[in-house]
Amino acid sequence: MAVYNYDVVVLGSGPAGEGAAMNAAKAGRKVAMVDSRRQVGGNCTHLGTIPSKALRHSVKQIIQFNTNPMFRAIGEPRWFSFPDVLKNAEMVISKQVASRTSYYARNRVDVFFGTGSFADETSVNVVCSNGVVEKLVANQIIIATGSRPYRPADIDFSHKRIYDSDTILSLGHTPRKLIIYGAGVIGCEYASIFSGLGVLVELVDNRDQLLSFLDSEISQALSYHFSNNNVMVRHNEEYERVEGLDNGVILHLKSGKKIKADALLWCNGRTGNTDKLGLENIGLKANGRGQIEVDENYRTSVSNVYGAGDVIGWPSLASAAYDQGRSAAGSMVDNGSWRYVNDVPTGIYTIPEISSIGKNEHELTQAKVPYEVGKAFFKGMARAQISGERVGMLKILFHRETLEVLGVHCFGDQASEIVHIGQAIMSQPGEANTMKYFVNTTFNYPTMAEAYRVAAYDGLNRLF
């Protein structure tokens, strides 16, 4: 067994692992990266964020073509199969892998491909694909192994018509009807993708409202948009069993209802990738969801072992994971880059997008904060009229006495970009966080950014 010595070993090359490895390497540490795939990038690059967003982009382009009157004048609507649009995602994945591979090379991070597990608190055994075992010894270790879809034991995921959010990328045809069980972020995103391809979607939600953590007006806007685009949302439903057939799949619900479709996509929960890490060898134990507990410095109960990304739970976003990994390494090497990552904007890549940061109306009402609301509807914005993306709104919540911006919520095209203007103002200290910024700032015209000015005037005009 070959033995290699490092200052830091990072388990997992997704966003959290990458952020940790880069920060530790730039602090002068000798770093090794371990990943179970033969390519870097983690689930984010190969099965999650990148392929699903590339799929979404392709589908959005198809929708734009098929709904634009100018294109309708010169030809019939065009429809593409799921495998067709998946080809674009595969090209993006290869480009991402190449970019990330170069990052590790430039920063002299050694990458080991194989299954890593703890031998003890300072060493990791890596079983390579050829069966060779290599031992990495390090002063500090970061767990950033990510998560995978939760699979109930009573569902046969080996059936050719039953998929989860990882295996759906192997779907070789376009179903006419699809059941999506689980209406969280991933379920809603895939509902948008498949409905955009003309698939009838049954979206089964075990709650009474879509994405209940969102501002209720934004959630309602998504529900309304779904109802107009071949998505049937069924709230307050739980599965009894899933019956796989040769010609389809039947979802039996506890309410007594039955739904039949060509395929079923399971999107109900995720579990941390900790079961193969040998945590018992270092005295660590994952919770029931496979996640490990860390403190505000991202340190586990084992003093030299840290955790970051989906494997530690909330918020389970690629954007947050990268910052958590970077901060975990910052805490480890003490280079001043640590921060506790909690000011995270939400980005949901449905069609249209949703993004938000800060408090929503329910939270402010519960806290008895005297707030006011300013809105800008995209249908009145020149840029939206030019682009044809007229669905959506920007909503700003602010303190009616101090004018402090308390929350920004956006539904519509480019929402995940638009929200960052509000985020920048909300992060300003003291009186610099104010609605006055939006009315006293000249925005390029026409842009979607000027929605902030429109919403600010709308809100300030409500004051008396």
Curated annotation (Swiss-Prot):
Keywords: Cytoplasm, FAD, Flavoprotein, NAD, NADP, Oxidoreductase
GO molecular function term, any single one: dihydrolipoyl dehydrogenase (NADH) activity
Annotated GO CC locations: cytosol
Top-level EC class: oxidoreductase
Binding of FAD, residues: 35-44
Substrates-to-products reaction catalysed: NAD(+) + NADPH = NADH + NADP(+)
E.C. number(s) listed in UniProt: 1.6.1.1
Protein's cellular compartments: Cytoplasm
Cofactor, free-text remark: Binds 1 FAD per subunit.
GO biological process, one term: 2-oxoglutarate metabolic process
Keyword hit for Iron: no
NCBIfam families given in the database record: PRK05249.1
Family per similarity comment: Belongs to the class-I pyridine nucleotide-disulfide oxidoreductase family.
Function statement: Conversion of NADPH, generated by peripheral catabolic pathways, to NADH, which can enter the respiratory chain for energy generation.
This protein's name: Soluble pyridine nucleotide transhydrogenase
Species this chain originates from: Pseudomonas savastanoi pv. phaseolicola (strain 1448A / Race 6) (Pseudomonas syringae pv. phaseolicola (strain 1448A / Race 6))
Protein encoded by which gene: sthA
